[in-house]
């Protein structure tokens, strides 16, 4: 077996480097996207159920009452399994929202009626600390129900420090 020439070695090195240049960024992009699945899908489930809830209730109680951050302590750099009663708040039950598997984000639901306009609004929030440094990421979706109209989710999602 003969040794590689400098030219052959350079060609192999260049091809290998090119493959890494393409594969590594794609890997990290997909890794980042997989970590964002939980808050995006969780909020989507929550707001979809909030809009369905509003369709069955009068204007002044279009959405269930506010629910605290659940779990109260945002998991720090790990996926945590919740205590059995963590999702027993009336709002989580009304929205059919809970986690039965370990997860990395905490969720909150706020609702309020504007007394001047009678517009009912909600904010669904997810907080996470994927790297465990104590700095939280925030994902937030808003919705409303204007008198005489069906409830709707407002366009867009607020995201702050998405991979924190």
Regions found by a protein language model. Give the residues of each.
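Short, glycine/small-hydrophobic-rich surface segments
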Residues: 40-45, 50-97
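Low-complexity, S/T/G/P-rich flexible repeat/linker segments used as non-globular hinges
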Residues: 136-164
